[in-house]
Amino acid sequence: MGLSLEQKKAMVQEVAAVAKEAHSAVGAEYRGLTAGQMDALRQQARENGVYLRVVKNRLAKRAVEGTEFECMQSELTGPLLLAFSLEDPGAAARVIKAYSKEHEALQTRLVAVGGQVYPASELERLASLPTREEALAMLLATMKAPVQKLATTLNEVPGKLVRTVAAVKDAKQAA
């Protein structure tokens, strides 16, 4: 049984609201996955802050209208599931990439970031982006390195003096 007009409108509104908040989107063909495998994929997506939904292409085109993912409209053909990254740009790509390694039936068709559509081959680059926490840790380490090096250098001068005095003391005691 098909969806009623009200259900379709609600679905379009839901996907449009998610698309407005999302950082990136991945479209993947799910033909060949069982219901159990789809449930496992949905569970994995939820755990990683990814909105995953199978939407009819016509409804998906309406949902992404007016968002930065409007560029995807021409690519929405065939049985696709849409995965939107809500927390960090690489989350959806990491989920789809990891799941497609286990299940070859899941084929990435498109990747959209920043108002541009990229081929499926760019999934690897998007998946390798660091999470927000990892990026902040890398930035902090980069900022901390010069200060730490300066502190070590400044600490070395008195340390060298202490070692020299200790060596002179040992030499006098030995003599």
Curated annotation (Swiss-Prot):
One of its GO terms (cellular component) is large ribosomal subunit. GO terms for molecular function: large ribosomal subunit rRNA binding; structural constituent of ribosome. Transmembrane segments: none annotated. InterPro entries: Ribosomal_uL10, Ribosomal_uL10-like_sf, Ribosomal_uL10_bac, Ribosomal_uL10_bac_type, Ribosomal_uL10_CS_bac. PROSITE patterns: RIBOSOMAL_L10 (PS01109). Keywords: Ribonucleoprotein, Ribosomal protein, RNA-binding, rRNA-binding. It holds the Pfam family Ribosomal_L10. One of its GO terms (biological process) is translation. Forms part of the ribosomal stalk, playing a central role in the interaction of the ribosome with GTP-bound translation factors. Belongs to the universal ribosomal protein uL10 family. HAMAP family: Ribosomal_uL10. Part of the ribosomal stalk of the 50S ribosomal subunit. The N-terminus interacts with L11 and the large rRNA to form the base of the stalk. The C-terminus forms an elongated spine to which L12 dimers bind in a sequential fashion forming a multimeric L10(L12)X complex. This is Large ribosomal subunit protein uL10. It comes from Alkalilimnicola ehrlichii (strain ATCC BAA-1101 / DSM 17681 / MLHE-1). The gene is rplJ.
